[in-house]
């Protein structure tokens, strides 16, 4: 069997199992809602396993477990410092995804524990360089929603079932020929986009389109100092550029809060370190970020024929002032092009 065939089979198996897990939630809510739970739980598993791997390295020469080290004041502070430096957050041993899976198996799990654990991850970043990349990251995963069940017991049972299924997926395995975690995310984002119909463009650029755009802006370039997407959606287009050449920093802006969270998760899931990306949550045309910066490459799949204010104040905006006329209120396409050209170095 060729590697390509092996990859294809691994992907098909992964996709089949992922969609089966998604179907556990399908009866309770629409696709856009259960997307947030599935992707959020995958992301929490990723954060947990990342922390576990870092701690395993730190304690490699010590005869002590994660749990034992955390009970010791000196060890605990050292581990916190190491985790904050290397991954930008820390997770207490009892809050790890694997620890909660054991609770589920022993029928001791409570969904409130998961909700608290998620809050603690975000709190751990306060005052750190990583704070902006983590705060509010799970805000769309409402674990108290009655859509998951009318009682805490019902919600606990449903989320516990999903977590058990996710725990069985081999995201990290020496025999895997594909980027399991990245592929899982891209598959689910794409599948949810297909279900969303026209609204899909708000958060997802089809892989074929992303690939063409990424190849165009990286043609003949061994590396990019930075790349910018003013309407970055889930971040898939930015990440595609990184597959074509070495990218040192990713910048993006996204006005939809749910999609903004998805983009930050996607960056971290694809092992982009927290200090190497900056995704901002605001309207690109009306409230632009990064006005003091220039970029080696700018890519985008903007919302075509979108409306904007075309306020007269923008006649003096350096992005538009050289053209003598603003894009019409009914179609902002030209404004997006002018915006992108302005940011090019």
List each language-model region with its residue ranges.
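Non-catalytic, mostly N-terminal accessory regions of nucleic-acid modification and defense proteins
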Residues: 1-212, 216-217, 275-284
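Short alpha-helical functional segments enriched in proximate histidine and acidic residues
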Residues: 195, 270, 343
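Hydrophobic alpha-helical scaffolding
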Residues: 152, 174, 252-256, 297, ...
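Conserved S-adenosyl-L-methionine
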Residues: 199-300, 305-322, 334
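Glycine-rich S-adenosyl-L-methionine
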Residues: 319-344
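Short, solvent-exposed loop/helix junctions and linker helices
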Residues: 31, 156, 292, 330-334
């Amino acid at each position: 069997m060729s590697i390509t065939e092996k990859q294809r089979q691994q992907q098909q198996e992964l996709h089949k199992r992922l969609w089966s897990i998604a179907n556990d939630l399908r009866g309770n809510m629409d696709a856009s809602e259960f997307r947030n739970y599935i992707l959020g739980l995958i992301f929490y598993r990723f954060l947990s396993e990342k922390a576990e791997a870092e701690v395993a390295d730190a304690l490699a020469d010590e005869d002590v477990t994660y749990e034992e080290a955390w009970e010791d004041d000196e060890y605990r502070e050292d581990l916190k410092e190491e985790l904050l430096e290397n991954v930008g957050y820390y997770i207490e041993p009892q809050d790890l995804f694997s620890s909660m899976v054991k609770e589920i198996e022993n029928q001791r799990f409570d969904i409130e524990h998961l909700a608290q654990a998620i809050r603690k991850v975000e709190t751990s970043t306060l005052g750190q360089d990583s704070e902006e990349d983590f705060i509010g990251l799970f805000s769309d995963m409402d674990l108290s929603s009655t859509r998951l069940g009318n009682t805490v017991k019902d919600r606990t049972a449903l989320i516990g079932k999903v977590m058990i299924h996710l725990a069985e997926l081999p995201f990290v395995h020496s025999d895997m020929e594909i980027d399991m975690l990245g592929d899982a995310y891209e598959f689910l984002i794409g599948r949810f986009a297909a279900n969303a119909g026209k609204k899909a463009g708000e958060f997802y650029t089809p892989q074929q389109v992303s690939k063409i755009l990424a190849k165009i802006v990286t043609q003949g370039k061994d590396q990019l100092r930075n790349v910018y997407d003013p309407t970055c959606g889930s971040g898939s287009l930015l990440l595609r550029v990184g597959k074509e050449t070495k990218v040192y920093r990713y910048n993006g802006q996204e006005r939809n809060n749910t999609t903004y969270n998805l983009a930050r998760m996607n960056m971290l899931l694809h092992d982009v370190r927290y200090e190497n990306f900056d995704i901002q949550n605001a309207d690109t045309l009306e409230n632009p970020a990064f006005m003091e910066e220039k970029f080696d490459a700018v890519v985008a799949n903007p919302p075509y024929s979108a409306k904007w204010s075309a306020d007269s104040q923008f006649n003096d905006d350096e992005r538009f002032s050289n053209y003598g006329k603003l894009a019409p209120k009914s179609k902002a396409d030209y404004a997006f092009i002018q915006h992108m050209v302005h940011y090019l170095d």
